[in-house]
From Swiss-Prot:
Subunit: Forms a cylinder of 14 subunits composed of two heptameric rings stacked back-to-back. Interacts with the co-chaperonin GroES.
Reactions accelerated catalytically: ATP + H2O + a folded polypeptide = ADP + phosphate + an unfolded polypeptide
The species this protein was found in: Corynebacterium diphtheriae (strain ATCC 700971 / NCTC 13129 / Biotype gravis)
Positions annotated to bind ATP: T29, L30, G31, P32, D86, G87, T88, T89, T90, G418, N482, A483, A484, D498
Gene it is expressed from: groEL2
Record has Chaperone as a keyword: yes
Its job: Together with its co-chaperonin GroES, plays an essential role in assisting protein folding. The GroEL-GroES system forms a nano-cage that allows encapsulation of the non-native substrate proteins and provides a physical environment optimized to promote and accelerate protein folding.
Root EC class: isomerase
InterPro entries, A to Z: Chaperonin_Cpn60_CS, Cpn60/GroEL, Cpn60/GroEL/TCP-1, GroEL-like_apical_dom_sf, GROEL-like_equatorial_sf, TCP-1-like_intermed_sf
Protein name listed in UniProt: Chaperonin GroEL 2
Keyword vocabulary terms for this entry: ATP-binding, Chaperone, Cytoplasm, Isomerase, Nucleotide-binding
GO molecular function: ATP binding; ATP-dependent protein folding chaperone; isomerase activity; unfolded protein binding
Length: 546
C-alpha cells in the first residue's frame, strides 16, 4: 500500500490535532461533576460511560496523521488502566498539557532532546515525592473511600472494602480476588466463598446429601486426586475399602469418573453404605495439572499420576488429602480448611506470584491471580444489577475499575485526591532542579502540566480553573478542593484520596508519550484509498435509478 509522509512541524501538529480530539472527548468525564459520553455501538443499545479508557478505545479518526496521534494517547490510557485500573482520564489530561506546552517550545526553537531529558528528570523527581508522601492504607474505611470515589458511589466502595476483608478472614488480604458478575436483581450484593472453590460440580445428582439445596456436604472427608480417568472399579476398590474402614466420606477429583466405577459409587451412596462424591477436575491440559497440584498442596495429598509413578491400585491413605468440610453443588465445589502444610502452601503462593510477574499474557495473569487467591484466602463475588442493559454495563464497568483502584491503594498507599497531590508535588521542581537551557524548559513544562488535572476537575464543576489552582497551591499539604461541594478541606480526612500507584502511573505514562511526540521528526502513514466512483446514471436514491 502507498504511504504518505509528513515532516517536522507538519508531522507534530497532525499528531497533536488527533491527541486533542481524543483528549477533549475524554477529559469532560474527570472529577465528581464530570459528564458522561455516549458511545454508539454497531448493534444493540449505545453505552453511556465516564470511563476514560472505554471512550478512548471507541475513537477512530479519519485523517491518517490525526489517527496516529489519537492511537498514541490511547496507549497512555490503556497502559495506565492495565497497571493501576484507573487514572486513564488523568493520564490523558496530563499528556495533552505536556504535549501542548512542549510543542509550543519546540516551535519557538528549543531542542526537543533537551526538553525530553528535562521532562524525564522532572517526572522521576515528582514520582519520588508522591511515593514519599503516600500513606499506607490501614482501615476498611480508607479502602471504602478510595473505591467509592472511583465508582462514584460510596455504597459500592463499602462493598468492595468488605469483600477485601472478608476473603482474608477479617484481615486485609492483598491477594484477594474479587470478581464482578451481572445479576437479575437490583442493587449490589456481596457473596464470599470461604476456602477454595472451582467451577465443577458433582458428576451425578445422586451424590447430593441435601435434596432441598441439591448439594453434597462432606464433613472431615478424605480427598483423592487423580490426573486421569477412572472407569475400572477394580483399580479403585482396594482404596475404597481402606477409606470405608475409617468411617469417613471420600471426595474424588479426577479427569472423569465413568462406567462401573461411577455406578458402584452411586449405588453405595444410595444404599447408605458409603458416602462419596465424584467431581471432574477443573481446566484443561497444563492448567488442569497445575490446579490439581494446588489442591494437593492445600489438602496435604499427592496427585495420583503415572508421571510420578503412582497408580490407584497401590494408593494408600497417606496419599489422600483432608479438609474440614467440602460442599459440592451441581455447578461448583468448595474445599474449606484443607489440611496442607502451611510452609508448602506459602512456597506455592510465592511460585505463582513469580509466574504472574513473568507472564506477558493478561489472560494468564488473571488465571494465575485466581489460583493465588484460592490458595491464600478465598474469592468474593460482587453481583450487580440495574434497571436497563445500558445501565448494567456501565455500572459493572465502574465497579471493576473501583476494585482495581482499591487493590492499587493497598499495594502502594494513598495520596490526596482531586489532582491536589500532583499540584502540590510541583514544589520539588523549584529552581528547575538546577538545570539550564532546554532541560530547564522541560522541567518547567512538567511543573505547569501538574496543575492540569485539578484545573479540569474545577472546570467540570463549573468553577474558575486558574483561581482554584492558585488557591490550592498556597494551601497546606493535603488540603484542596472538594469539587462535589465546592469547599476547600483536608482531603485525606474527608476521604478524598487516590492510590499513589494510579497518580504516578498517570504521570509516568503521560510523560513517556509526550517525550515521543516532541522528538518526532517524521510520520509515515497509509495513503487513504480514493473514494469509489459513483455508478453511471446514479441519482440521489442510492444509485438504483428509482
Amino acid at each position: 500500500m502507498a504511504k504518505i509522509i509528513a515532516f517536522d512541524e507538519e508531522a507534530r501538529r497532525g499528531l497533536e490535532k488527533g491527541l486533542n480530539t481524543l483528549a477533549d472527548a475524554v477529559k469532560v468525564t474527570l472529577g465528581p461533576k464530570g459528564r458522561n459520553v455516549v458511545l454508539e455501538k454497531s448493534w444493540g443499545a449505545p453505552t453511556i460511560t465516564n470511563d476514560g479508557v472505554s471512550i478512548a478505545r471507541e475513537i477512530e479518526l479519519e485523517d491518517p496523521y490525526e489517527k496516529i496521534g489519537a492511537e498514541l494517547v490511547k496507549e497512555v490510557a490503556k497502559k495506565t488502566d492495565d497497571v493501576a485500573g484507573d487514572g486513564t482520564t488523568t493520564a490523558t489530561v496530563l499528556a495533552q498539557a505536556l504535549v501542548r506546552e512542549g510543542l509550543r517550545n519546540v516551535a519557538a526553537g528549543s531542542n526537543p532532546m533537551g526538553i525530553k531529558r528535562g521532562i524525564e528528570l522532572a517526572t522521576a523527581k515528582v514520582t519520588e515525592a508522591l511515593l514519599a508522601s503516600a500513606k499506607e492504607v490501614e482501615t476498611e474505611e480508607q479502602i471504602a473511600a478510595t473505591a467509592g470515589i472511583s465508582a462514584a458511589d460510596p455504597a459500592i466502595g463499602e462493598q468492595i472494602a468488605k469483600a477485601m476483608y472478608a476473603v482474608g478472614g477479617g484481615k486485609l488480604n492483598k491477594e484477594s480476588v474479587i470478581t464482578v458478575e451481572e445479576s437479575n436483581t437490583f442493587g449490589v450484593d456481596l457473596e464470599v466463598t470461604e476456602g477454595m472453590r472451582f467451577d465443577k460440580g458433582y458428576i451425578s445428582g445422586y451424590f447430593a446429601t441435601d435434596m432441598e439445596r441439591l448439594e453434597a456436604v462432606l464433613e472431615d472427608p478424605y480427598i483423592l486426586l487423580v490426573s486421569g480417568k477412572i472407569s475400572n472399579i477394580k483399580e479403585l476398590l482396594p482404596l475404597l475399602e481402606k477409606v470405608m474402614q475409617t468411617g469417613k466420606p471420600l471426595l474424588i477429583i479426577a479427569e472423569d469418573v465413568e462406567g462401573e466405577a461411577l455406578s458402584t459409587l452411586v449405588v453405595n451412596k444410595i444404599r447408605g453404605t458409603f458416602k462419596s462424591v465424584a467431581v471432574k477436575a477443573p481446566g484443561f491440559g497444563d492448567r488442569r495439572k497445575a490446579q490439581l497440584q494446588d489442591m494437593a498442596i492445600l489438602t496435604g495429598s499427592q496427585v495420583i499420576s503415572e508421571e510420578v509413578g503412582l497408580s490407584l491400585e497401590t494408593a494408600d491413605l497417606p496419599l489422600l488429602g483432608r479438609a474440614r468440610k467440602v460442599v459440592v453443588t451441581k455447578d461448583d465445589t468448595t474445599i474449606v480448611e484443607g489440611a496442607g502444610d502451611s510452609a508448602q502452601i506459602d512456597g506455592r503462593v510465592n511460585q505463582i506470584r513469580t509466574e504472574i510477574e513473568n507472564s506477558d499474557s493478561e489472560y494468564d495473569r488473571e488465571k494465575l491471580q485466581e489460583r493465588l487467591a484460592k490458595l491464600s484466602g478465598g474469592v468474593a463475588v460482587i453481583k450487580v444489577g440495574a434497571a436497563t442493559e445500558v445501565e448494567l454495563t456501565e455500572r459493572k464497568h465502574r465497579i471493576e475499575d473501583a476494585v482495581r483502584n482499591a487493590k492499587a491503594a493497598v499495594e502502594e498507599g494513598i495520596v490526596a485526591g482531586g489532582g491536589v497531590a500532583l499540584l502540590q508535588a510541583a514544589h520539588v521542581l523549584a529552581n528547575d532542579l538546577d538545570l539550564t537551557g532546554d532541560e530547564a524548559t522541560g522541567v518547567k513544562i512538567v511543573r505547569e502540566a501538574l496543575s492540569a488535572p485539578l484545573k479540569q476537575i474545577a472546570l467540570n464543576a463549573g468553577l474558575e480553573a486558574g483561581v482554584v489552582a492558585d488557591k490550592v497551591s498556597h494551601l497546606p499539604a493535603g488540603e484542596g478542593l472538594n469539587a462535589a461541594t465546592g469547599e476547600y478541606v483536608d482531603l485525606m480526612a474527608a476521604g478524598i484520596n487516590d492510590p499513589v500507584k494510579v497518580t504516578r502511573s498517570a504521570l509516568q505514562n503521560a510523560a513517556s508519550i509526550a517525550a515521543l511526540f516532541l522528538t518526532t521528526e517524521a510520520v509515515v502513514a497509509d495513503k487513504p484509498e480514493p473514494a469509489a466512483p459513483a455508478m453511471p446514471g446514479a441519482d440521489e436514491m442510492g444509485g438504483m435509478g428509482f
